[in-house]
Design a protein with these regions (language model features):
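Short beta-strand elements
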Residues: 74-82, 126-129, 171-174
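Periplasmic OmpA-like peptidoglycan-binding domain that tethers envelope proteins to the cell wall
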Residues: 61, 90, 96-123, 133-210
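Juxtamembrane linker/hinge segments adjacent to a transmembrane helix in small membrane proteins
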Residues: 1-86, 92
Length: 210
């Protein structure tokens, strides 16, 4: 169950694997270092084991976040997915912004207040990324030259709101505008375009590299 493409950095991934091996050696009472290495016959097998471990961890976090959303009556407004790298919260653009605007609605602030508490509880030791996305309909605005600028401004608005209203460390938060480059639905229909207009917040697994 996940969205997006999992892309690994070769060097950092190998460092993670080395740490994984070291931890396994320190924590095993009855196994030698060579025994730990012999469990895997290649770097690819080690990488697969690490990814599987991260996937299980992120699945547990995603389930916990989903339960928190249900308790806060946000399950219909915020969807949750996960990969081996991160747990993702996705919100429709219409929930947060008026058409062509980067100013948060009052309703959006109420939702982000609750999402912020969840991020404080489960993402305070992680890198958190905020991404803005649009459909592929060209924007005609004196404020924004294109959808790329609009999506960037929307991600920044969410970033500023969270840094002002939560205890999250701003240095742990990232923001980016993706324009219409990463659609999750068919832009040829209104329903698809509505799904593509969104903001995603990702809580990265501490053992992965942002």
């Amino acid at each position: 169950i996940g969205e997006g493409i999992l892309i690994s950095n070769g060097v950092s991934q190998l460092n993670d694997l080395d740490e994984y091996i070291s931890n396994a050696g320190r924590n095993a009472d009855s196994e030698t270092d060579s025994d730990n290495y012999e469990k895997y016959d290649s770097a690819e097998a080690l990488e697969e084991a690490l990814n599987e471990k991260n996937l299980e961890s992120n699945e547990e976090l995603a389930e916990t976040v989903q339960e928190a959303l249900v308790e806060d009556s946000l399950a219909d407004q915020v969807s949750v997915s996960f990969t081996a790298q991160y747990v993702q919260l996705s919100m429709k653009g219409a929930l947060l912004f008026d058409s062509g605007s980067d100013s948060l609605k009052d309703q959006a602030k109420e939702v982000l207040d609750k999402v912020g508490v969840i991020l404080e509880r489960y993402g305070s030791n992680s890198t958190i990324e905020i991404e803005g996305h649009t459909d592929n309909v060209p924007i005609h605005s004196a404020r924004f030259a294109d959808n790329e600028e609009l999506s960037s401004a929307r991600a920044l608005s969410v970033f500023y709101y969270l840094t002002e209203t939560t205890s999250l460390d701003p240095s742990d938060l990232r923001h980016a505008g993706m324009g219409d480059r990463v659609p999750v639905a068919d832009n040829s229909t209104e329903e698809g375009r509505s799904k593509n207009r969104r903001v995603e917040i990702r809580i990265y697994n501490p053992s992965t590299t942002y």
